[in-house]
């Protein structure tokens, strides 16, 4: 294999391992287990992972667990810190507390108190439910007007079960408003294979990090495309299945600058309706082509995995 082919192969292997890490943060993730995912020796995989990602594998796993815990501290303020630590793969609360303070410079409790999410009682967000809607069951759909900073956003909000959804993706690392290159690579790969013109195909972004927690340069997100069946991928193009289950789904009609507020509003609505975030994929799926919208806005579904309190 030439150098370019080798690099593509390594990229594919690393992405497969990262996909496994993201889906199994609550389980053992040592070097031996992870290198076995791609049939490489622990020593060899450790070298190529560190070179590609800029940090050793063990440090990457610990950081991901800590940042996942930090997100849960904010989005699930009533969940005990011990429960969050165990859910994120720490088998000792003392190890979790020591690592958390080393990474964030404060205790988990202080971090939770300092960084109030919008769903706290001091929230700048306010939601107004359309009273013409009826609640038929614990699975409901309601129209909402979100008020923040003197501006309003309309959305429909629903708690519902979503089926698993296979996707192909191109991974992006860095600022979340710079994902155009990843989408361009995805489309360039998918178009000649006839995947772009499949009826019902949707584009989406899957977010693996919370921008309020993870530094901008390490943010990871996937530019994705729905597919109906398993596709043979290669190099930077990978595939996995979006987790099914109970989701909070909010449909917004918004401009690019309104996406952060829409996400914060969704977390506010999740808490308002007696739910909390849980493990699973957080993503937005695009329902239109913004270039065809008269105001150049996106019609987007924001999907957050949840469970009832």
Located regions from the model:
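Short helix-loop boundary/capping segments at the starts of domains
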Residues: 26, 40, 51-54, 66, ...
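A short, Lys/Arg-enriched amphipathic alpha-helix from helix-turn-helix/homeodomain DNA-binding modules
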Residues: 2-29, 62-79
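Short, flexible active-site loop motifs that bind/organize anionic cofactors or intermediates
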Residues: 24, 35, 74, 86, ...
């Amino acid at each position: 294999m030439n150098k370019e082919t080798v690099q593509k192969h390594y990229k594919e292997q690393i992405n497969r391992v990262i996909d496994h890490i993201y889906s199994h943060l609550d389980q053992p993730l040592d070097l031996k287990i992870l290198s076995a995912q791609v049939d490489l020796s622990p020593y060899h995989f450790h070298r190529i992972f560190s070179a590609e990602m800029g940090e050793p594998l063990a440090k990457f796993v610990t950081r991901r667990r800590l940042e996942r815990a930090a997100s849960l501290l904010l989005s699930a303020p009533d969940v005990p810190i011990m429960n969050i630590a165990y859910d994120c793969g720490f088998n000792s609360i003392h190890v979790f507390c020591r690592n958390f303070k080393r990474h964030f410079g404060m205790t988990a409790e202080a971090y939770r108190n300092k960084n109030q999410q919008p769903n706290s009682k001091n929230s700048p967000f306010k939601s107004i439910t359309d009273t013409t809607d009826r609640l038929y069951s614990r699975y409901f759909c309601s129209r909402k007007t979100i008020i923040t900073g003197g501006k309003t956003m309309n959305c429909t909000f629903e708690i519902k079960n979503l089926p698993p959804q296979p996707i192909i993706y191109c991974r992006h690392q860095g600022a979340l408003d710079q994902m155009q290159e990843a989408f361009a690579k995805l489309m360039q790969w998918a178009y000649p294979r006839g995947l772009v013109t499949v009826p019902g195909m949707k584009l989406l972004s899957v977010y693996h990090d919370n921008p309020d927690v993870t530094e901008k340069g390490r943010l990871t997100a996937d530019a994705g495309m729905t597919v109906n069946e398993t596709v043979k991928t290669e190099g930077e193009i990978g595939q996995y299945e979006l987790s099914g289950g109970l989701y909070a789904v909010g449909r917004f009609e918004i401009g690019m600058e309104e996406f952060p507020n829409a996400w914060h509003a969704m977390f506010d609505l999740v808490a308002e309706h007696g739910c909390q975030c849980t493990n699973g994929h957080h993503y937005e799926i695009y329902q239109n082509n913004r270039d065809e919208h008269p105001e150049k806005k996106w019609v987007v579904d924001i999907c957050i995995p949840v469970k009832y309190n």
